[in-house]
């Protein structure tokens, strides 16, 4: 099946592109802007830097007067992507990311025992999450709160998702939106130890500030949580890709 699904293309003097003959180039696909550059698990190493196709090609053609036309084309995510970094801020600050607060026990009462700022949407033990607590002699029992101020880039219906090893939920402006806390089903993520993802949708307005809080409770030495959000599509993605291709000299 894998062999039959492959298509072999012959390069008949198409590549490499002649920059002197191209004024517009189309970059189409969901991995053009944010590509998957490494694997998961033991292959999930964090590189010193990343260059994704849109960024790399744009930098290469920066001085060539070549216009880059980008279109996402479709969604291929198994899990929802992270909140846009440029639209998410530590509450009360201009810094992008989440304020992460750690509490002892199963509640969020009192002052947090530790705070840090993190970015991304996947946090687990094998990448160093909560490392300072996992080395303790006593089996850790912690509650963690991820908080960010989110300013939606467009108005519409946003879909949020969360799953974890342990209990998790998402709140928007203090109101619970996604509940993977009161009941759970077995999932596939994190070596099959996590619960299945749960999702819910909410209408948000462009430019308005929303407090997004992800609450997480775990017991043991293998914390793992992932959460994401898909914003509404401003256009029909497939139609947009077709228009971009027609308007370009190379795709």
Q: Which residues does each predicted region cover?
A:
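Cofactor-pocket helix-loop regions in the catalytic cores of large enzyme subunits
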Residues: 1-18
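Acidic/polar, compositionally biased interaction segments
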Residues: 75-249
């Amino acid at each position: 099946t894998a062999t039959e699904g492959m298509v072999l293309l012959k390069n008949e003097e198409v590549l490499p592109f002649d920059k002197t003959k191209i004024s517009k180039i189309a970059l189409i696909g969901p991995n053009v802007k944010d590509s998957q550059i490494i694997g998961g698990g033991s292959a999930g190493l964090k590189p010193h830097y990343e260059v994704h196709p849109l960024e790399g090609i744009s930098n290469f053609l920066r001085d060539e007067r070549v216009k880059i036309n980008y279109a996402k084309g479709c969604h291929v995510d198994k899990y929802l992507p992270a909140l846009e970094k440029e639209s998410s801020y530590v509450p009360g600050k201009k810094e992008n990311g989440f304020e992460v607060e750690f509490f002892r026990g199963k509640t969020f009462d009192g002052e947090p025992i530790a705070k840090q700022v993190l970015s991304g949407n996947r946090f687990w033990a094998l990448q160093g999450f909560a490392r300072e607590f996992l080395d303790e002699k006593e089996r850790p029992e912690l509650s963690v709160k991820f908080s960010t101020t989110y300013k939606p880039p467009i108005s519409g219906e946003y879909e949020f998702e969360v799953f974890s090893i342990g209990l998790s939920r998402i709140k928007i402006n203090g109101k619970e939106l996604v509940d993977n806390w009161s009941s759970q089903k077995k999932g596939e993520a994190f070596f099959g130890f996590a619960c299945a993802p749960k999702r819910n949708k909410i209408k948000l307005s462009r430019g308005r500030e929303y407090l997004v809080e992800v609450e997480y409770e775990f017991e043991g030495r293998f914390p793992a949580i992932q959460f994401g959000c898909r914003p509404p599509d401003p256009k029909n993605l497939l139609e947009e890709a077709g228009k971009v291709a027609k308007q370009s000299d190379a795709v």
